[in-house]
Amino acid sequence: MGPDPAWPPVLVAEDLLGAGVVAAFTGRVGGSSAPPFATLNLGLAVGDDLRRVLANRRRVATVLGLAGHPWALARQVHGATILRVGTGRPGAGRPAAGRPQADTVGREVGTAAARGPWVEAGGLGQGPPEGKAPLGEADGLVSSEAGVVLAVLTADCAPVLLADPEAGVIGAVHAGWRGLAAGVVEGGVAAMAALGADPAAVVGLVGPAVGGCCYEVGADVREAVGDRYPAALATTRDGRPALDPAAGAVQALERAGVGQVRVAGECTVDLAGRHFSHRRDHGRTGRQAGLIALVPSGTGGGR
C-alpha cells in the first residue's frame, strides 16, 4: 500500500514558536498503513506492520525537516512521571541545569539518553535495535538539546506540546484523565522550569483529543478530574456526564502560569476521517503523535 496523498501528513503549528522550534500534531491520513491502522499510524505497539510504521515516521520527519534526528518516546502509562531527554553527545544543544529535581507531583525528573532514530521504551512492539532502546515509563518528556524530537502518541488523550523558545526548552505531555488527575501537565511545566524555562514565556499547544461531546465517563472518573479541573466537566450530546481532556489541559496550563495557550479544538471521535480514536474504534486503531523539537534557525522544512 503506497502513501495516501489525500491529506497533508501533519498539522504544523506555524508562527507561534519562532524559527528555533518545530512542532506538529499528526492525523491519520498521509501514510502507508492498512486498515484498521490506515494510514499514518505512528504507534509500534498496536499490531501494525513494523515497516509501514517506520516508513510513516520517516515521512513525517522528512516533511518537518527533521529527517535523521532521534525521536524520543517513553512507555506511556497514564501517570505523571516526567523524563528529561538528551542525546548523550557532549556539547549537544544548550547545557542542562543541575541535577534531576522533584516535579510538582513529587516524582523525580529522570534522565534518559536518546540513541537512534526511533527511541521507544522497552516492550513497545518488535522492531530493529533502534526501536527497543528504553526511555522508561513516563507521560511527559522535556529537553534543552537541539535535534531531539520529543513525541507523545495518542488516540483520544490530549497531546500537549510546550516550548520556551527564548530559553531553548521544550516539552511534550500525554494527558489522559488519569494523568490530568495526577498533575502531569503541571509536572511538565515544572520540569521545564528546572531546565531554565520561564512558565510565563512558555507557549502551550493542546492537540486533537476526544471532546466532551463524546467522552461519557462514570462518576468516579468525573470526580477525580473535575475536582481538580472544573473546566474539564462536560456533557455529551445526549446529556450524559462527560469529560473534556483538552479543556482540563488548558486549565492545568493556566494554573501552571503558562503565558500563551492554543487549542486545536478537534474531537478525535467525531472526525473519523482525520484522527485515530481508541474509543470510537473499540481499541483497534492506530496512533497519531504530538512532536516537538529544537532546531537551528532556518531549518525545519515543514514550517
Residue spans for each PLM region:
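Active-site microenvironment for binding and transforming phosphate-containing groups
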Residues: M1-R303
